């Protein structure tokens, strides 16, 4: 459905500037509604409307940054560039974005693109001093936004899909798990493919932890981490404060797995940063969830050693 919306934008926009403006406004509305980004950003502005733009010395009306988001649990901002392209995006078309967002005030970067990156551009996103994430058309398609309800006349009024309700077999699995934990402190839930293991893990977690407690969720790949993070934030009935821990090194990443920037969510392999972030944000208003790949579990362990953080559910 999102592809149909974008095609309508193309057919109705006489100029590339108009097309870009429409796409930017759509992405701003999306970031302010998708639970994954609502938990990450406290506000999102068009570049020209960013209230602190001049305070940070940025005066140009539009030289590479399209949107600015305030990081909810951080003093910094995220610079966002929206690329409405049909063909692979060359590195040269990202130059102004990298330069401008590196001058001050920004601690994260996000590129939202409707096309793939060229090989050189993709390589440039890795190992940046200011981390870069990339959101794709597929991310928008799989988001919890009900694109069928989108109105071209009211692009700021997006709607979310309703949250899932447990199916009978998932409710039975939940009951079995809770029963098992009455007599044991660990267990194994085995479910067939396609039966909703990720969602079942969420409803189990929601029954076992309360606000202010902490969960560690381990996965074998960056791709599965991305899928789980999106699924949990979309259907959770309690506020979640999420952290992603994963490595993009060739030694720890399967060739078929995603690159770390494709997670479209800030990730870290720095134990000190992880420990500091958890310690500074943990309170009784949300459940803290650390999503980590198996390969990066040592980072989580080091963070625990530095702060004494204990997980209530693993």
Regions found by a protein language model. Give the residues of each.
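Extracellular/luminal Protease-associated
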Residues: 98, 108-112
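SF2 helicase/translocase NTPase motor core
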Residues: 1-18, 41-58, 102, 114-314
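Local beta-strand N-terminus motif with an aromatic residue
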Residues: 65, 76-77, 106, 287, ...
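Catalytic centers of nucleases
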Residues: 19-104, 122-123
């Amino acid at each position: 459905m999102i592809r149909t919306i974008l095609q309508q934008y193309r057919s109705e926009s006489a100029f590339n500037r108009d097309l870009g403006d429409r796409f930017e406004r759509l992405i701003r509305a999306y970031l302010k509604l998708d639970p994954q980004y609502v938990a990450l950003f406290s506000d999102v502005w068009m570049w020209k409307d960013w209230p602190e733009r001049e305070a940070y010395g940025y005066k140009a009306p539009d030289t590479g940054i399209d949107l600015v988001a305030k990081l909810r649990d951080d003093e910094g901002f995220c610079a966002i560039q929206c690329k409405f392209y049909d063909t692979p995006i060359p590195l040269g078309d990202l130059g102004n974005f990298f330069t401008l967002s590196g001058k001050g005030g920004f601690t994260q970067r996000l590129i939202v693109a409707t096309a793939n990156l060229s090989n050189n551009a993709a390589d440039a996103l890795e190992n940046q001093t200011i981390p870069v994430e990339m959101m794709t058309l597929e991310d928008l398609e799989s988001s919890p936004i009900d694109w069928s309800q989108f109105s071209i006349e009211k692009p700021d009024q997006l709607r979310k899909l309703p949250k899932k309700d447990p199916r009978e077999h998932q409710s039975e699995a939940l009951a079995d798990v809770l029963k098992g934990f009455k007599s044991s402190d660990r267990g194994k839930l085995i479910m067939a493919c396609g039966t909703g293991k990720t969602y079942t893990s969420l409803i189990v977690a929601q029954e076992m932890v309360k606000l202010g407690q902490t969960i560690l969720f381990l996965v074998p790949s960056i791709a599965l981490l991305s899928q789980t993070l999106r699924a949990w934030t979309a259907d959770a009935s309690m506020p979640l404060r999420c952290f992603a821990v994963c490595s993009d090194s060739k030694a720890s990443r399967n060739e078929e797995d995603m690159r770390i920037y494709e997670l479209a969510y800030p990730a870290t392999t720095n134990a000190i940063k992880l420990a500091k972030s958890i310690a500074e944000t943990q309170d009784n208003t949300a459940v803290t969830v650390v999503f980590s790949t198996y390969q990066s579990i040592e980072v989580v362990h080091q963070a625990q050693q530095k702060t004494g953080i204990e997980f209530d559910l693993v």
